[in-house]
Amino acid sequence: MHVGVLGGTFDPPHNGHLALALFARELLCVDRLILSVSDNPLKQRRSASDSQRKAMTELLCHEINRTGTFCDACGWELEQKRPSYTVNLLRFVRSLYPSARLSLLVGEDSWRNFGSWKSPEEIEELADVVVFARGAEHMTERPDAVSGIRFVEFSCPLSSTMLRGRIAEGQSVSSLLPSSIDRYIRREGLYGE
């Protein structure tokens, strides 16, 4: 079994996350994808609560799973009493899937700081690291010294920050996220001024 792990604040989850999940399933041959909702240490005024972010991530998984069970939302990081690091998350996932092949899915922006992450060597021992690069022109700028890191081109102009800003300005984002998440955001009154 091949298990992919994608961590993030998912504040809110959007169609870029949906596309990345489907990409992982179809092109990386991931059998199970864990979307781990992480703590947001830089909480801003217009951020959703932990429980709201987890609920929206569960809605995203429901959308992804319409074509077969594949994706699970995980709140393990939110339940920790101390800061959780990627290496801790991977140890937890390894305990759930002791014989599975693990792949950590990260965006290029996050990967650029990989050397400063806690225990990067152990991360590479626990999982293959797959970096989603923003495009071929950016992939040529990446450091090549890191072995065992796989780069794949995946360009998505969406960001949760952009969506929160648009919602705060009263703009519609209904075409940029699954309809169930759009309804949830409106029902809960999230990200408004």
From Swiss-Prot:
Q: Which reaction does it catalyse?
A: nicotinate beta-D-ribonucleotide + ATP + H(+) = deamido-NAD(+) + diphosphate
Under InterPro entries, the record lists:
Cyt_trans-like, NadD/NMNAT, Rossmann-like_a/b/a_fold
Q: Keywords in alphabetical order, please.
A: ATP-binding, NAD, Nucleotide-binding, Nucleotidyltransferase, Pyridine nucleotide biosynthesis, Transferase
Q: What's a BP term from Gene Ontology annotated to this protein? A: NAD biosynthetic process
GO molecular function terms attached to this record: ATP binding; nicotinate-nucleotide adenylyltransferase activity
Q: Does NAD count among this protein's keywords?
A: yes
What general EC class does the enzyme of this chain belong to?
transferase
Q: In which pathway does it act?
A: Cofactor biosynthesis; NAD(+) biosynthesis; deamido-NAD(+) from nicotinate D-ribonucleotide: step 1/1
The EC number on file is 2.7.7.18
What is the top-level taxon of the source organism?
Bacteria
Q: Which cysteines are joined by disulfide bonds?
A: none
Annotated family = Belongs to the NadD family.
This chain's function reads: Catalyzes the reversible adenylation of nicotinate mononucleotide (NaMN) to nicotinic acid adenine dinucleotide (NaAD).
Name the UniProt record assigns to this protein: Probable nicotinate-nucleotide adenylyltransferase
Which lineage is the organism of this entry classified under, starting from the top rank?
Bacteria, Pseudomonadati, Chlorobiota, Chlorobiia, Chlorobiales
